[in-house]
Amino acid sequence: MEGARIPFYTQKMNDSVHSKRRPAAKPASSALAKRTNDPERTMAGILEVALREFADKGLSGARIDEIAAATRTSKRMIYYYFGSKEGLYLAVLEHSYREMRRIESELTLDNLPPEDALRRLVEFTFDHHATHEDYIRIVINENMERGKYLAQSQIIQELNVPAISAIERLYARGLAAGVFREGLDPVDIHASISALAFFNVSNQHSFGQIFKRDTTAPAARALRRASIVEMVVRYVRR
């Protein structure tokens, strides 16, 4: 039965999940510019276009044939790489989290004083979410699915371990230096940072309509960014 075959993408991710080095995704435009037999390039192009499709229309509304047309591939090729529409959707979710964690790992937080490291982490999270609206929208879609597809992922928890480990180290250094207060949970700190940065994007349109403020204006965004940083730092500070 075709559904029993392990998709190419799943095999590759299972083989590489423990690897610290992952090539950055190539832009879809690059994937279209040169027709090659490079699976990495082909999958990167499919994932980029599929992210927009799923973010715009959700899992039920997204069309594989539209993704195939936009990437100049075929439905058959997409199914070969990802197994099914649901498999592609899960791959897009995993890839979105993986890319965020990859960039996050380059922040060199361990080289900064604890409070500076915390500020940098909050700033990064805010900036990432503000410039990756499709990521926010697909996470919203998955929550509307009650996390059903992420629950099927074999790698999602491991992908996010480094994020919590970084906060654990940062927090431990802050405790040792006497600048952070005791009794805080690193996962809770992570949740607070994520929630504040996430809301700024997920609710920007409804918030703007209700309060008649353009939250996307550079000045408004800079003010909100500074406010969120201060909220988190003051919460953790001793």
Where does each model-flagged region fall?
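All-alpha amphipathic helical-bundle segments outside canonical DNA-binding/catalytic cores
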Residues: 116, 152-159, 176-192
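Amphipathic alpha-helical linker/stalk segments
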Residues: 92-121, 151, 158
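Amphipathic alpha-helical segments used for helix-helix packing
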Residues: 117, 131-154, 204-211
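C-terminal peripheral helix-coil segments that are non-catalytic and often amphipathic
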Residues: 1-30, 124-127, 131, 161-177, ...
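Helix-turn-helix
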Residues: 45, 53-87, 91-92
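Generic hydrophobic, amphipathic alpha-helix propensity
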Residues: 42-50, 67, 92-96, 100, ...
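Amphipathic alpha-helical interaction segments
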Residues: 45, 116, 120, 124, ...
